[in-house]
Amino acid sequence: MAKEKIRIRLKAYDHRILDQSADKIVETAKRSGATVSGPIPLPTEKTVYTILRAVHKYKDSREQFEMRTHKRLIDIVSPTPQTVDSLMRLDLPSGVDIEIKL
């Protein structure tokens, strides 16, 4: 397992929870003896929704809402079996989406 690389991609709407989760993952991986690269901030995805304020007419009166998705990338270059085991047992907040690729 020494030649493999684990790529962890994190997504969340709140950047503070995302950074806390990334720090927790990096700390756990370093404690188990793996080499860690990251967290690397990826571009923030911004989705804008425009709706009409009025129900029937007044199309000039609109309101815009936006949703920002913050992303981070963590590469674990030389994972040990202990690293994989400790990452599986790691408890992270519910607002963070995690993708793990081996």
From Swiss-Prot:
Superkingdom classification of source: Bacteria
GO biological process: translation
Family per similarity comment: Belongs to the universal ribosomal protein uS10 family.
PANTHER family: 30S RIBOSOMAL PROTEIN S10 FAMILY MEMBER (PTHR11700)
Protein name: Small ribosomal subunit protein uS10
InterPro entries: Ribosomal_uS10 (IPR001848), Ribosomal_uS10_CS (IPR018268), Ribosomal_uS10_dom (IPR027486), Ribosomal_uS10_dom_sf (IPR036838)
Designated gene of the protein: rpsJ
Gene Ontology molecular functions: structural constituent of ribosome; tRNA binding
NCBIfam families assigned: PRK00596.1 (NF001861), rpsJ_bact (TIGR01049)
Complex formation: Part of the 30S ribosomal subunit.
Keywords from the named record: Ribonucleoprotein, Ribosomal protein
